[in-house]
């Protein structure tokens, strides 16, 4: 299969074949990251702009490392260091970046749809690194890679996503992607954190953590996104953790070889207890490692290096 897509905007857009191609390509880059000299000349002469209008640690650093390991020139721009603070529109900023002739623009923005707007404005490839509560495709891809490597495949597995589903772009991207790969997805959380129409995406809904993780092969815990909430949707963090914190007792309801995942940042003692986050079931740090390989694969494919 030849890669033909210009942008990575969401898991909803990707075909099963494209997902397989990304994950297979990422596997080859895992070996690069394990070397003493973690650099290959694949993207020498290419320029990657990481334009993060919304705060990020893992994703921005991961994209920067991915570009540098492929020998690309990487430039990081934050909202506070851009002309957005002077009143320039996002569209004008994008056109100015386009005029500098980079090869890929990676964007994170608090507004859903911002990457899609840029993709229609500029000729460069756009990677959505998270847009509001909409999508976060590279996170879903690294999650799928982690599951596939640990379980030997994806089809037929039971994956439960627990937490603030309503405000989570990670949940939405994983639902789109996992459904396409034949995974049975269950979402769980308080009723105030579950969108009313979520079942239309092909998921099962539970309001009990214990019920949701019965027979689960993978449990994906999400933090409460207080920065996106317009009002209090639960009485207190203590009450939330009483019912929805994954701990050594309730995890016994899941399969013995269950994987525990978290996109980070982790709020220990709220959605997940420390002994589970650091325990034998946890693959949280493996997700981070795989994230670099997945983002290397995306940059490699979008710049045409594969051809």
From Swiss-Prot:
It is an enzyme of class 2 (transferase). Carbamoyl phosphate binds at residues 58-59, 108, 136, 139, 264-265. SUPFAM superfamilies: Aspartate/ornithine carbamoyltransferase. Transmembrane segments: none annotated. The keyword Transferase applies. One of its GO terms (biological process) is amino acid metabolic process. GO terms for cellular component: cytosol. One of its GO terms (molecular function) is amino acid binding. Pathway: Pyrimidine metabolism; UMP biosynthesis via de novo pathway; (S)-dihydroorotate from bicarbonate: step 2/3. Pfam families: OTCace, OTCace_N. Keywords: Pyrimidine biosynthesis, Transferase. InterPro entries: Asp/Orn_carbamoyltranf_P-bd (IPR006132), Asp/Orn_carbamoylTrfase (IPR006130), Asp/Orn_carbamoylTrfase_sf (IPR036901), Asp_carbamoyltransf (IPR002082), Asp_carbamoyltransf_Asp/Orn-bd (IPR006131). It catalyses: carbamoyl phosphate + L-aspartate = N-carbamoyl-L-aspartate + phosphate + H(+). L-aspartate binds at residues 86, 169, 223. Catalyzes the condensation of carbamoyl phosphate and aspartate to form carbamoyl aspartate and inorganic phosphate, the committed step in the de novo pyrimidine nucleotide biosynthesis pathway. Heterododecamer (2C3:3R2) of six catalytic PyrB chains organized as two trimers (C3), and six regulatory PyrI chains organized as three dimers (R2). NCBIfam families: asp_carb_tr, PRK00856.1. This is Aspartate carbamoyltransferase catalytic subunit. It comes from Syntrophus aciditrophicus (strain SB).
């Amino acid at each position: 299969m030849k890669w033909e897509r210009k942008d990575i905007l969401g898991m909803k857009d990707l075909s099963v074949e494209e997902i397989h191609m990304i994950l297979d390509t990422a596997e080859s880059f895992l070996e690069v990251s394990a070397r003493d000299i973690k650099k290959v000349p694949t993207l020498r002469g290419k320029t990657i702009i990481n334009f993060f209008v919304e705060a990020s640690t893992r994703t921005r650093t991961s994209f920067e490392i991915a570009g540098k390991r492929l020998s690309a020139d990487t430039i990081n721009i934050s909202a506070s260091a851009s002309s957005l603070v002077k009143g320039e529109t996002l569209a004008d900023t994008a056109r100015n970046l386009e005029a500098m002739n980079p090869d890929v623009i990676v964007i994170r923005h608090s507004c859903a749809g911002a990457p899609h707007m840029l993709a229609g404005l500029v000729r460069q490839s756009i990677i959505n690194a998270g847009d509001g509560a909409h999508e976060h495709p590279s996170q879903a891809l690294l999650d799928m890679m982690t599951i596939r490597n640990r379980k030997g495949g994806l089809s037929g597995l039971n994956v439960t996503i627990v937490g603030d589903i309503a405000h989570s772009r990670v949940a939405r991207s994983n639902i789109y992607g996992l459904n396409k790969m034949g995974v049975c997805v269950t979402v769980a959380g308080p009723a105030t954190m579950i969108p009313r129409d979520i079942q239309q995406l092909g998921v099962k809904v539970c309001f009990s953590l214990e019920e949701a993780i019965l027979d689960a092969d993978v449990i994906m815990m999400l933090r409460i996104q207080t920065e996106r909430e317009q009002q209090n949707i639960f009485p207190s963090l203590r009450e939330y953790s009483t019912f929805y914190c994954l701990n050594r007792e309730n995890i016994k309801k899941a399969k013995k070889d269950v994987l525990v995942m978290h996109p980070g940042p982790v709020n220990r003692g709220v959605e997940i207890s420390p002994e589970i986050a650091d325990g034998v079931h946890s693959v949280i740090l493996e997700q981070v490692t795989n994230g670099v390989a997945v983002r290397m694969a995306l940059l490699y494919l979008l710049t045409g290096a594969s051809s």
